[in-house]
């Protein structure tokens, strides 16, 4: 029995879906359940191994769709500059280095190559661009060997990608992919041709040779849902619901508008062996909705998408008046509201600090806001970090997200005994924040009046630090966190997979 977990992409600023999968990988390892994590997107900006290792996957757990048809293993980049140069005819006349970019010039051939290093202080090359007569003609991608190339031709005075090639370890061609208008149009193998990605995905799933006791867990389905459903029927199919699954405002007693990311799965729920949600509240709502709006009654299991190996206690006293938030720095996380609230609250609590962990598209904008407020001394952007031992140094966790399917950072925060302040929204905040006991739930309205929101945060921040209840609230957070200890989540996964195995044996 193997558990195959299907996702689309992964990046350095991964979403909660990828972190949920990484937690799941740890749990499945601990209960000795063989598992694979499959990524279906084209990922060439970075070696996928660097991205998956970064959040805790093991190389042998990873299947990348486009690499699957080769004999090249998922592995870190180790090809060196010297190895790259050895494959280029002639000797470079000069070179330039700036950060992680090294450029070699061959004026006798009117060409240069640009090497992109994995790290500035190393000579491992992730990919190389070849420019001839001022035009980009090829890119090569490396791990421990070259695993892919992209070919370009001039079109409308711009380099246009027209072909990708994937290799075996010995350098022979595994297959070619033809590109038209930036879209994958054709996949040419030595013994077959596919004319769409759907056909390629179907062939891939058939190559897995799924058995009755295998389990396919679909984490994201955009563009692949129908094929996965059809090819997984010989195994057991599970679907994980990672977010709010319906639009409350657009639903009525006669009609429900499912979240478009789950519409296909819910519409075809009779083909699903089980759904997984992260909270009991979401399970209750989804069960009621299936009863009310459909004739399908699928199995729904509640399994937290993360877990805590143990509760974490501070090794030294927490820093007074210290606050932390952690998330992707994206617009929907509304970190700007937390910055504004901290600036206002700081006027009354001059020792107040806020550390912001995470990376994302809003980072530069947030940095400017902090600088414009003159708040650099007490609001800091901390980037990515392993937060497991960091939370316990703070006194309060803030979240301004208006929708959180579970909230891994909320779980981690209560596991380190932090009180929390966030909106009274399903499901994560209402699960981890017991209003008035380990923090505060703030009212939220659909129109998001910014001044009112910021004022509400300011009021509760000042209240929490002024009432002297931090220790009492901290203890209540630890009590909430006990429900998410790894031992309990392991038991939930063991039970679900046992039920699946028993059912497949019938």
Swiss-Prot record:
E.C. numbers: 2.4.1.-
One GO term describing the cellular component: cytoplasm
Keyword DNA damage in record: no
Keywords noted in UniProt: Cell membrane, Cytoplasm, Glycosyltransferase, Membrane, Nucleotide-binding, Transferase
Membrane-protein topology: Peripheral membrane protein
Coiled coil spans: none
Pathway, per record: Protein modification; protein glycosylation
Region named R-fold-2: 307-506
InterPro entries the record matches: Glyco_trans_1, GtfA, GtfA_EBD
Stored CDD domains: GT4_GtfA-like
Localization of this protein: Cytoplasm; Cell membrane
GO MF entries: glycosyltransferase activity; nucleotide binding
Stretches the record annotates as Extended beta-sheet domain: 79-195
Positions annotated to bind UDP: 16-19, 328, 357, 383-385, 409
Binding sites annotated in the UniProt record for N-acetyl-D-glucosamine: 242, 405-407
Record remark: domains: Has 2 Rossmann-like domains, called R-fold-1 and R-fold-2. R-fold-1 is interrupted by an extended beta-sheet domain that loops out of the structure. UDP and N-acetyl-D-glucosamine bind between the Rossman-like folds, which move closer together upon binding.
Family statement drawn from the similarity comment of this UniProt entry: Belongs to the glycosyltransferase group 1 family. Glycosyltransferase 4 subfamily.
Protein's name according to its UniProt entry: UDP-N-acetylglucosamine--peptide N-acetylglucosaminyltransferase GtfA subunit
Species of provenance: Streptococcus gordonii
């Amino acid at each position: 029995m193997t558990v195959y977990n299907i996702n689309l992409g992964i990046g350095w600023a991964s979403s909660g879906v990828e972190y949920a999968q990484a937690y799941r990988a740890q749990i499945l390892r601990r209960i000795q359940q063989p598992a694979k994590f499959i990524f279906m997107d084209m990922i060439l900006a970075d070696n996928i191994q660097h991205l998956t290792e970064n959040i805790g996957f093991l190389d042998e757990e990873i299947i990348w769709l486009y690499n699957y048809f080769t004999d090249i293993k998922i592995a870190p980049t180790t090809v060196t500059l010297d190895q790259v140069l050895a494959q280029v005819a002639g000797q470079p006349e000069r070179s330039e280095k700036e950060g992680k970019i090294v450029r070699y010039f061959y004026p006798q051939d009117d060409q240069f190559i640009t090497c992109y290093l994995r790290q500035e202080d190393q000579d491992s090359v992730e990919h190389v661009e070849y420019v001839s007569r001022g035009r980009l003609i090829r890119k090569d991608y490396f791990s421990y060997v070259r695993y892919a190339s992209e070919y370009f031709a001039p079109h409308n005075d711009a380099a246009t990608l027209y072909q990708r090639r994937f290799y075996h370890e010995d350098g022979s061609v595994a297959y070619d992919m033809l590109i038209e208008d930036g879209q994958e149009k054709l996949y040419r193998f030595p013994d077959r041709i596919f004319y769409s990605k759907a056909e390629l995905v179907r062939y891939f799933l058939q190559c897995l040779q799924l058995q009755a006791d295998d389990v396919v867990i679909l984490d994201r389905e955009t563009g692949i849902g129908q094929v996965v459903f059809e090819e997984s029927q010989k195994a057991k199919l599970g679907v994980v619901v990672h977010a709010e699954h319906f639009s409350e405002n657009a639903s009525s007693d006669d009609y429900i508008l499912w979240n478009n990311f789950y519409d296909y799965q819910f519409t075809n729920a009779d083909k699903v062996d089980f759904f997984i949600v992260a909270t009991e509240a979401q399970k209750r709502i989804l069960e009621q909705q299936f009863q009310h709006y459909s004739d399908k009654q699928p199995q729904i299991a509640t399994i937290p998408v993360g877990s805590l190996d143990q509760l974490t206690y501070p090794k030294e006293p927490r820093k007074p008046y210290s606050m932390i938030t952690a998330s992707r720095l994206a617009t929907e996380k509304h970190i700007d509201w937390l910055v504004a609230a901290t600036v206002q609250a700081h006027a009354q609590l001059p020792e107040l600090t806020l550390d912001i962990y995470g990376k994302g598209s809003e980072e530069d904008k947030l940095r400017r806001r902090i600088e414009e407020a003159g708040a650099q001394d007490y609001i800091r952007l901390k980037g990515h970090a392993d937060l497991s031992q960091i939370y316990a140094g703070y006194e309060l966790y803030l979240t301004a997200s208006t929708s959180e399917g579970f909230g891994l950072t909320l779980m981690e925060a209560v596991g380190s005994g932090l009180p929390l302040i966030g909106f009274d929204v399903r499901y994560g905040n209402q699960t981890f924040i017991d209003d008035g006991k380990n923090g505060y739930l703030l009212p939220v309205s659909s129109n998001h009046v910014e001044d009112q929101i910021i004022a509400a945060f300011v009021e509760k921040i000042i209240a929490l630090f002024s009432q002297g209840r931090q220790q009492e609230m901290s203890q209540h957070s630890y009590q909430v966190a006990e429900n998410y200890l790894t031992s309990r989540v392991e038991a939930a996964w063991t039970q679900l997979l046992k039920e699946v195995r028993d059912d497949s044996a019938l």
